[in-house]
Amino acid sequence: MKFLILLTEGIGLRNFSMTRFLSLLCGEGEVVIWHALPEQIGHVHDHPFADRLRWQSMPEHHEGQLPFLFRRAKLIAQLYWQNEAGTETVLKRTTLRGKGVYKLRNRLAEALGRACGRSHNQILWLDDMHARAVRQSRYFVDFLKFLNLERPDVVFCTHQRSPLAVPAMLAARQLGIPTATFIYSWDNLPKGRMAVHADYFLVWSQHMKDEMRNYYPDVAEERIFVT
């Protein structure tokens, strides 16, 4: 079996590559770590299964204006749709600052999020628009090419809130490769921090599974696993 692991930031590196996780996977087959980290990171640890483990840098890419707009609007819409106590506080804490075009972009995302926060169907529309914007980016074809060449049995994202993982997950799903992601923290669900979508979701507890079903009713119960 061939596993492809997405590592886009230090949190995933700490939680997975510095634990027994990689050893367990290497015992089952080949592992490719597709990362957006400094190149020397892959050589830090002398892994006992080095012959089954390969580090590969992702294509250089940055989140464009449209992908950011729809991702940010989706987060805000999710908070308004939940309409829970503390929503305004969370919004204030996540308010982005900027000047010129960035200030305009942030305000537009907030306005769009407020307008689409009335129903879950509108949030799904934002999610679809976000995916379309990423697929139309100039770097998306590079992700398709790499995954088509590697053809892993599963793509696992170590952190569901990372925008850098979005093109890889979308490319995998477009090619029919099963995908899974880990919900990093219990408070990521009520905060609307879901940049990537996957075929399967891994959570910490039954309570998190129940919250996942509540906040994301489009995700069937059999797609959520308690680890």
State the predicted function of each range.
Residues 145, 188-200:
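Membrane-proximal helix-turn-helix segments that form the acceptor-binding/catalytic region
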